[in-house]
Each structure stands twice: as structure tokens, then as C-alpha cells.
Amino acid sequence: MISVVVVDDSAFMRKALSTMLEKDPEIRVVATARDGEEGLQVIRQHNPDVVTLDIEMPRMDGLTTLRHIMMEMPRPVLMVSSLTTEGAEATLKALELGAVDFIPKQLSKVSLDIVRIENDLREKVKEVSKRRMLRTPRPVRPAPTASAPAQTAQVASAAPATAPSRPAMPATRASRPVRDVVAIGVSTGGPPAVQKVLSQLPADFPASILIAQHMPAAFTGPFAKRLDGVCAISVKEAESGEKLKPGTAYIAPGGKHLRVEQRVSHMEVVVTTDPADALYKPSANVLMESVGQSMGRRALGVILTGMGSDGMEGMKVLKQKGGRSIAQSDATCVVYGMPKAIVDAGLADEIVDIDDMAAAIMNGLYK
């Protein structure tokens, strides 16, 4: 049985979340609280497996409460967020502080998505209850430069995640990388993981990066802006018609897909709603397939932490066209779903701990 504490100043939300969660016989809401101070008391009392935490509350807000939880009694925390720019910025800060994911607060609205939201909530609670959390993503070693060999990333299956990385054997590199486009698919637990990876890449990174992160439309712009402020490379929300540039990461806008298309003299970004019936928007499958079809062996596909199997079908195409693939290790995922699908399908060329992912990507451009 998975125990949950719900912390929210809205009586409606406390009731709604509790009702949704307890529809699953494996989940029990052991207590609720109306603000952060009361929340800390009931968390200490009940020691729950998972906490859902509102951001805006009287007396003690969600971010302050989260800091106390992470310092005193770390456990998986799901933030309850409004789908606004302000809500997005606060939620991204919460993810940086240690929250594992977020759920939308607009549960009071009549919506055709309510069943999906309920299912996602229960699935997230069940998945994150099994996993350890990623801490605030700060670089753990100096970023490699494009002209100097990076350390070889450690394969998770060969050694524990806590083992030190071994220096790479000097690699004989071509004057230009073999691969010049990196496609990244990621979901639950993704923002801290993406920040950890991108913040370790050098400003002269010789490839373009395209990222499909499962995230609402109001969140992707602030997410890109936050990353751009802490990374040596440029990070932006993708716009149709842009020419792909090395040393730039393009974040797919929430609610839309990200593709690339060959033009006469360059590769171009395409933002689209097609296919409309895709389970996720943005979709890692759509991104991987497009990059595979357009770039062939010039593509490097990376699947990071996330629920489900989005990215697997697209990765099949990328691999068939000569691309290379990397999956995040089980030991370092918040949720080992999307990477597991790649590994189980035999599509992963490397399985890498998140701390070593930037180095693996650097080296992967030359393989």
C-alpha cells in the first residue's frame, strides 16, 4: 500500500485529489493538510511514501515547505500547479529544489481530459513511490570542450551509479563530428535531468539539440528561459522556420510536436500539431522518427527518465537509418519507463548514468 499526504489550502482540491488517488486500491491518503506548517506536522507523523504539495498557501507556501521536506525528510513530492506562466516558474523552481514532477490544478474544470489526468496522477504516485529523487542539478565536473576528449560515460549495467568515472582512452577524432543533431525524449523527472545534462555541455558544442519534454504549453517557454540562464549553450523554445544551429538546444513547445526538415542548404525546425491523435504533445516518437528520417547516421537519440514508452517507435526508425542511441540508467531515473522500453527493445547502444550523460553525448557525436 502506498501512503500519500495531500497538502493544499483548498478544501475542494484536498477532497478531489484524495478521491482520485483512492480509486486505486494500492493507494491510501493517510492525511491532508491546509498549509505548509500543518503539512510538515502530518508528514512527520505519518511518514508517507509520497506527498502532493500546493504551491500557493497561507502561513507557509509550497516552496518553503518543500525546502523543509528535502532537508529533514526527503521523499517524492508532486507539486500541484496552476497552468500559468507564474505557476510554471514556481513549479520549475520546485523541481530544481527536489520535487519529482507536477500535476495540473485545473481539476475543477469540466474537461474531456479529466480521466487522463486522474490516471496520470495515480500512475505518477505509484511510479515515483518506487524511485529515489534527483537532487538539484548542479554540474559535478568541469564541462568538456568540443576540442578535448570528454570522459567516457560509465555504463550503468557495468558498475554501480556511485562508482567514479574512469578516464576515457584518448579517442582519435575526425575534424568534424560524425553526428550533428541530438534528439532527446524525456518525461517524468525530466527538468532536473535535462538541466544536469545541458549545463555540462560547452559553449562550442558542435551539434544542435532538439528536446521533446512532456510539459504543458505554459511551461516550455519558462523552462527554456531558465535553462538558457544556467547553460553555456543557447537554449530556446523552438519556432517553425528556424535554421538549426550548433550549440543551440530547441525545446518543443507544449501541446505541439517538434520535427526537422531538409532545406536546400540547411536543416529547419518545424513545429506542428500533426499528428493530432498522438498520446503526448510533444511526442518523443514524432521527434525521433523525424530526426532519423532527415538526418540518418548524423543523428544521436537520447532517452531520459519518464513514464511509459514514448520514443521507442521513433527510435526504431532512427536506428534503422544509421543513428546512434543512448538510454539513461535505471539507477538514476526518477521513473524508469521510457529508457526501459528502449533497452528492452534492444535499441540502446549505451546505458548511462545521468551524471555521465553529457560526456556520453559529447563522445557519441564522434562514434
Curated annotation (Swiss-Prot):
Spell out the reaction equation it catalyses.
[protein]-L-glutamate 5-O-methyl ester + H2O = L-glutamyl-[protein] + methanol + H(+); L-glutaminyl-[protein] + H2O = L-glutamyl-[protein] + NH4(+)
The record's Pfam families line, in alphabetical order, gives: CheB_methylest (PF01339), Response_reg (PF00072)
Domain Response regulatory, chain residue ranges per copy: 3-120
UniProt protein name? Protein-glutamate methylesterase/protein-glutamine glutaminase 2
Domain comment (free text): Contains a C-terminal catalytic domain, and an N-terminal region which modulates catalytic activity.
- General function of this protein: Involved in chemotaxis. Part of a chemotaxis signal transduction system that modulates chemotaxis in response to various stimuli. Catalyzes the demethylation of specific methylglutamate residues introduced into the chemoreceptors (methyl-accepting chemotaxis proteins or MCP) by CheR. Also mediates the irreversible deamidation of specific glutamine residues to glutamic acid.
Keyword entries, A-Z = Chemotaxis, Cytoplasm, Hydrolase, Phosphoprotein
Segments forming domain CheB-type methylesterase = 175-367
InterPro entries found in the cross-reference section = CheB-like (IPR008248), CheB_C (IPR035909), CheY-like_superfamily (IPR011006), Sig_transdc_resp-reg_Me-estase (IPR000673), Sig_transdc_resp-reg_receiver (IPR001789)
Residue ranges with Low complexity bias: 143-174
Q: Which family does it belong to?
A: Belongs to the CheB family.
Q: Which GO terms describe its molecular function?
A: phosphorelay response regulator activity; protein-glutamate methylesterase activity; protein-glutamine glutaminase activity
PROSITE patterns from the UniProt entry: CHEB (PS50122), RESPONSE_REGULATORY (PS50110)
Taxonomy, superkingdom: Bacteria
Post-translational changes noted in the entry: Phosphorylated by CheA. Phosphorylation of the N-terminal regulatory domain activates the methylesterase activity.
| Major place of residence | cytoplasm
Q: Which GO terms describe its cellular component?
A: cytoplasm
Which classification does the entry list for the species? Answer: Bacteria, Pseudomonadati, Thermodesulfobacteriota, Desulfovibrionia, Desulfovibrionales
Q: Report the residues modified as 4-aspartylphosphate.
A: 54
Gene Ontology BP annotations:
chemotaxis
Q: Which SUPFAM superfamilies match?
A: CheY-like, Methylesterase CheB, C-terminal domain
Q: What Enzyme Commission number(s) does the record list for this chain?
A: 3.1.1.61, 3.5.1.44
Subcellular localization(s) per the UniProt record: Cytoplasm
Question: Where are the residues of the annotated region Disordered?
Answer: 132-174
